[in-house]
């Protein structure tokens, strides 16, 4: 089972990966000891910056563009690596610093992992 959670709420009890390209502000590295940082699976810098200019109006297009990015060879390999971690642990928590997880890249990533 995959789950999503804000990194700020993570207590360190479940296997987890950090899905953000940027390290979460105010989080010490030792708080995420044992958590893999999979920054290459996150949206590209240009896509992230474009999306953040108008999140409400651009979310649908952001989803479409991010799905295309996830089809690139490096991202496909990273998806497979994450699936292997999930298989190894039986569960995996997808962590993000996003305040609005439902309208972030994480649900798109989750759908790609379950595909």
Where are the regions a protein language model picked out?
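Residues lining hydrophobic/aromatic ligand-binding pockets adjacent to catalytic sites
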Residues: 1-115
């Amino acid at each position: 089972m995959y789950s999503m959670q804000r990194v700020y709420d993570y207590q360190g009890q479940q296997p987890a990966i950090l899905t953000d390209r940027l390290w979460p502000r105010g989080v010490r590295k030792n708080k995420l000891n044992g958590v893999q940082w999979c920054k290459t699976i996150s949206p590209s810098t240009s896509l992230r910056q474009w999306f953040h200019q108008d999140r409400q109006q651009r979310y649908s297009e952001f989803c479409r563009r991010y799905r295309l990015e996830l089809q690139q060879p490096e991202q496909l390999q990273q998806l497979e690596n994450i699936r292997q971690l999930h298989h190894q642990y039986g569960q995996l928590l997808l962590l993000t610093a996003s305040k609005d997880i439902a309208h972030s890249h994480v649900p798109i990533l989750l759908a790609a992992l379950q595909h």
